[in-house]
Amino acid sequence: KSYKTVRDFQHGFMRDFVENILKKTATDFTYNGLENVTSKCNMFVSNHRDIALDAAILCYVFAINDMECFEVAIGSNLMQGDFVIDIAKINKMFKIARSGSAKDFYRDSILASEYMRHVINEKQQSVWIAQRNGRTKDGDDKTELGVLKMFSLSSDKAFVENFAELNITPIAISYEYEPCDFLKTMELYISSFQKYVKEPGEDLRSIIAGIMQQKGKIKISVTPSITREELEYCD
Protein backbone atom coordinates (compact mmCIF):
# COMPACT_ATOMS: atom_id res chain seq x y z
CA LYS A 1 0.00 0.00 0.00
CA SER A 2 1.28 3.48 -0.84
CA TYR A 3 0.98 6.60 1.29
CA LYS A 4 1.07 10.12 -0.12
CA THR A 5 1.54 12.10 3.09
CA VAL A 6 3.26 11.71 6.47
CA ARG A 7 -0.15 11.80 8.15
CA ASP A 8 -1.39 8.96 5.92
CA PHE A 9 1.70 6.90 6.80
CA GLN A 10 1.37 7.52 10.53
CA HIS A 11 -2.40 6.97 10.60
CA GLY A 12 -2.08 3.90 8.38
CA PHE A 13 1.12 1.86 8.52
CA MET A 14 2.43 3.06 11.91
CA ARG A 15 -0.98 2.81 13.54
CA ASP A 16 -1.34 -0.81 12.39
CA PHE A 17 2.29 -1.59 13.34
CA VAL A 18 1.93 -0.35 16.93
CA GLU A 19 -1.51 -1.94 17.29
CA ASN A 20 -0.02 -5.28 16.28
CA ILE A 21 2.79 -4.88 18.84
CA LEU A 22 0.25 -4.14 21.58
CA LYS A 23 -1.88 -7.15 20.66
CA LYS A 24 1.13 -9.47 20.77
CA THR A 25 3.04 -8.11 23.76
CA ALA A 26 0.55 -6.38 26.09
CA THR A 27 -2.20 -7.97 28.18
CA ASP A 28 -4.03 -4.65 28.56
CA PHE A 29 -3.64 -1.13 27.21
CA THR A 30 -5.38 1.97 28.53
CA TYR A 31 -4.95 5.71 28.15
CA ASN A 32 -6.51 8.85 29.53
CA GLY A 33 -6.21 12.63 29.48
CA LEU A 34 -6.78 13.42 25.80
CA GLU A 35 -9.12 16.18 26.95
CA ASN A 36 -5.95 17.97 28.09
CA VAL A 37 -4.76 18.24 24.47
CA THR A 38 -6.34 21.49 23.32
CA SER A 39 -6.12 23.42 20.07
CA LYS A 40 -2.94 25.02 21.39
CA CYS A 41 0.23 23.12 20.47
CA ASN A 42 2.06 21.26 23.22
CA MET A 43 5.55 20.42 24.38
CA PHE A 44 4.92 16.85 25.56
CA VAL A 45 7.55 16.00 28.17
CA SER A 46 7.46 12.27 28.91
CA ASN A 47 9.11 9.86 31.27
CA HIS A 48 11.33 7.52 29.28
CA ARG A 49 11.21 3.74 29.69
CA ASP A 50 11.54 2.43 26.12
CA ILE A 51 13.60 3.85 23.26
CA ALA A 52 10.99 3.53 20.53
CA LEU A 53 7.64 2.74 22.09
CA ASP A 54 7.14 5.63 24.55
CA ALA A 55 6.55 8.12 21.73
CA ALA A 56 5.16 5.55 19.28
CA ILE A 57 2.37 4.48 21.64
CA LEU A 58 1.32 8.08 22.27
CA CYS A 59 1.30 8.70 18.52
CA TYR A 60 -0.85 5.57 18.14
CA VAL A 61 -3.33 6.97 20.66
CA PHE A 62 -3.49 10.19 18.67
CA ALA A 63 -3.95 8.29 15.41
CA ILE A 64 -6.86 6.14 16.61
CA ASN A 65 -8.53 9.33 17.81
CA ASP A 66 -7.90 11.06 14.45
CA MET A 67 -5.56 13.62 16.03
CA GLU A 68 -2.46 15.07 14.40
CA CYS A 69 0.71 13.31 15.51
CA PHE A 70 3.62 15.34 16.87
CA GLU A 71 7.29 15.78 16.05
CA VAL A 72 9.64 13.62 18.13
CA ALA A 73 13.05 14.47 19.58
CA ILE A 74 15.45 11.51 19.60
CA GLY A 75 19.10 11.11 20.54
CA SER A 76 21.63 11.55 17.75
CA ASN A 77 23.13 8.18 18.73
CA LEU A 78 20.00 6.48 17.34
CA MET A 79 20.27 8.09 13.89
CA GLN A 80 22.43 5.37 12.38
CA GLY A 81 21.89 3.65 9.05
CA ASP A 82 19.88 4.81 6.05
CA PHE A 83 16.81 2.73 6.94
CA VAL A 84 16.60 4.09 10.50
CA ILE A 85 17.12 7.65 9.27
CA ASP A 86 14.38 7.26 6.62
CA ILE A 87 11.91 5.87 9.18
CA ALA A 88 12.81 8.69 11.58
CA LYS A 89 12.25 11.38 8.96
CA ILE A 90 8.89 10.03 7.79
CA ASN A 91 7.74 9.95 11.42
CA LYS A 92 8.69 13.61 11.96
CA MET A 93 11.68 12.89 14.19
CA PHE A 94 14.60 15.24 14.72
CA LYS A 95 17.84 14.64 16.57
CA ILE A 96 19.13 15.95 19.86
CA ALA A 97 22.93 15.90 20.23
CA ARG A 98 24.21 13.27 22.65
CA SER A 99 27.95 13.77 22.25
CA GLY A 100 30.64 16.16 21.06
CA SER A 101 32.79 18.90 22.55
CA ALA A 102 31.27 21.27 25.10
CA LYS A 103 31.18 24.02 22.46
CA ASP A 104 29.50 21.83 19.85
CA PHE A 105 27.04 20.41 22.38
CA TYR A 106 26.02 23.91 23.48
CA ARG A 107 25.60 25.05 19.87
CA ASP A 108 23.53 21.98 19.00
CA SER A 109 21.38 22.48 22.10
CA ILE A 110 20.59 26.04 21.03
CA LEU A 111 19.62 24.84 17.55
CA ALA A 112 17.39 22.10 18.97
CA SER A 113 15.75 24.55 21.36
CA GLU A 114 15.14 27.07 18.58
CA TYR A 115 13.69 24.37 16.35
CA MET A 116 11.27 23.09 19.00
CA ARG A 117 10.03 26.60 19.72
CA HIS A 118 9.65 27.16 15.96
CA VAL A 119 7.61 23.95 15.61
CA ILE A 120 5.25 24.95 18.41
CA ASN A 121 4.88 28.67 17.71
CA GLU A 122 5.35 28.91 13.95
CA LYS A 123 4.58 25.49 12.42
CA GLN A 124 1.74 25.08 14.90
CA GLN A 125 2.60 21.47 15.69
CA SER A 126 3.34 19.71 18.96
CA VAL A 127 6.65 18.18 20.06
CA TRP A 128 7.44 15.07 22.14
CA ILE A 129 10.67 14.90 24.12
CA ALA A 130 11.91 12.63 26.89
CA GLN A 131 12.40 14.19 30.31
CA ARG A 132 15.98 12.94 30.49
CA ASN A 133 19.01 12.01 28.42
CA GLY A 134 18.42 8.29 27.91
CA ARG A 135 15.95 5.89 29.47
CA THR A 136 15.25 5.69 33.19
CA LYS A 137 16.96 2.53 34.36
CA ASP A 138 16.42 2.66 38.13
CA GLY A 139 12.69 3.42 38.18
CA ASP A 140 13.19 7.00 39.38
CA ASP A 141 11.51 9.26 36.82
CA LYS A 142 12.92 12.77 37.20
CA THR A 143 13.15 15.54 34.63
CA GLU A 144 16.79 16.45 34.13
CA LEU A 145 17.72 20.07 34.71
CA GLY A 146 19.66 20.02 31.42
CA VAL A 147 16.44 19.43 29.46
CA LEU A 148 14.79 22.46 31.07
CA LYS A 149 17.89 24.58 30.46
CA MET A 150 17.78 23.57 26.80
CA PHE A 151 14.17 24.75 26.55
CA SER A 152 15.19 28.19 27.80
CA LEU A 153 18.05 28.69 25.32
CA SER A 154 15.77 29.81 22.48
CA SER A 155 14.25 32.83 24.20
CA ASP A 156 15.51 35.93 26.00
CA LYS A 157 12.19 36.42 27.77
CA ALA A 158 11.77 36.09 31.51
CA PHE A 159 11.28 32.60 32.94
CA VAL A 160 7.48 32.59 33.10
CA GLU A 161 6.91 33.95 29.59
CA ASN A 162 9.71 31.80 28.19
CA PHE A 163 8.20 28.54 29.40
CA ALA A 164 4.55 29.57 29.03
CA GLU A 165 5.12 29.85 25.26
CA LEU A 166 6.01 26.16 25.12
CA ASN A 167 2.79 24.93 26.76
CA ILE A 168 4.59 22.10 28.56
CA THR A 169 2.35 19.05 28.99
CA PRO A 170 3.71 16.15 31.10
CA ILE A 171 3.17 12.60 29.85
CA ALA A 172 3.36 9.47 32.02
CA ILE A 173 3.70 5.97 30.57
CA SER A 174 3.98 2.79 32.60
CA TYR A 175 4.69 -0.83 31.69
CA GLU A 176 3.86 -3.70 34.03
CA TYR A 177 7.06 -5.41 32.90
CA GLU A 178 9.95 -2.99 32.43
CA PRO A 179 11.18 -2.94 28.80
CA CYS A 180 14.72 -4.33 28.47
CA ASP A 181 14.79 -4.94 32.22
CA PHE A 182 17.69 -7.41 32.05
CA LEU A 183 19.78 -5.14 29.82
CA LYS A 184 19.11 -2.12 32.04
CA THR A 185 20.03 -4.09 35.16
CA MET A 186 23.31 -5.21 33.63
CA GLU A 187 24.15 -1.63 32.66
CA LEU A 188 23.38 -0.37 36.17
CA TYR A 189 25.46 -3.14 37.73
CA ILE A 190 28.49 -2.51 35.52
CA SER A 191 28.15 1.27 36.00
CA SER A 192 28.37 0.77 39.77
CA PHE A 193 32.08 -0.06 39.56
CA GLN A 194 33.29 1.20 36.16
CA LYS A 195 32.31 3.40 33.24
CA TYR A 196 29.76 1.65 31.06
CA VAL A 197 30.67 1.60 27.37
CA LYS A 198 28.02 0.56 24.86
CA GLU A 199 28.87 -2.10 22.33
CA PRO A 200 28.36 -1.42 18.60
CA GLY A 201 24.72 -2.01 17.69
CA GLU A 202 23.58 -2.07 21.32
CA ASP A 203 20.95 0.66 20.85
CA LEU A 204 19.40 -1.21 17.92
CA ARG A 205 19.28 -4.43 19.96
CA SER A 206 17.56 -2.55 22.77
CA ILE A 207 15.00 -1.13 20.33
CA ILE A 208 14.18 -4.60 19.01
CA ALA A 209 14.09 -6.14 22.49
CA GLY A 210 11.78 -3.38 23.73
CA ILE A 211 9.38 -3.98 20.86
CA MET A 212 9.33 -7.79 21.10
CA GLN A 213 9.39 -8.23 24.89
CA GLN A 214 6.18 -9.00 26.82
CA LYS A 215 4.97 -5.86 28.60
CA GLY A 216 1.89 -6.89 30.57
CA LYS A 217 -0.37 -3.93 31.28
CA ILE A 218 0.48 -0.58 29.68
CA LYS A 219 -1.03 2.76 30.58
CA ILE A 220 -0.32 6.22 29.23
CA SER A 221 -1.65 9.45 30.71
CA VAL A 222 -1.70 12.97 29.29
CA THR A 223 -1.75 15.40 32.21
CA PRO A 224 -2.94 19.03 32.20
CA SER A 225 -0.44 21.53 30.81
CA ILE A 226 1.66 23.49 33.28
CA THR A 227 -0.16 26.76 33.89
CA ARG A 228 1.21 30.28 34.05
CA GLU A 229 0.27 30.37 37.74
CA GLU A 230 2.35 27.25 38.38
CA LEU A 231 5.28 28.77 36.52
CA GLU A 232 4.97 31.97 38.57
CA TYR A 233 5.08 29.86 41.72
CA CYS A 234 8.35 28.29 40.52
CA ASP A 235 9.93 31.62 39.53
Identify the role of each PLM range:
Residues 35, 46-50, 76-78, 97-100, ...:
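Short, flexible loop/turn elements at secondary-structure junctions
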Residues 1-42, 48-59, 63, 85, ...:
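Membrane-anchoring hydrophobic helices of lipid-metabolizing enzymes
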Residues 40-42, 68-71, 125-127, 167-169:
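Generic beta-strand structural signal
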Residues 41-113:
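Long, hydrophobic, well-ordered secondary-structure blocks that form the structural core
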Residues 29, 42, 70, 93-94, ...:
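A broad, low-specificity signal marking well-ordered, structured residues that form hydrophobic/aromatic
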Residues 37-40, 89-96, 125-132, 219-221:
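Glycine-rich, often proline-containing surface loops adjacent to acidic residues and nearby aromatics
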Residues 105-235:
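Non-catalytic C-terminal accessory region of glycerolipid acyltransferases
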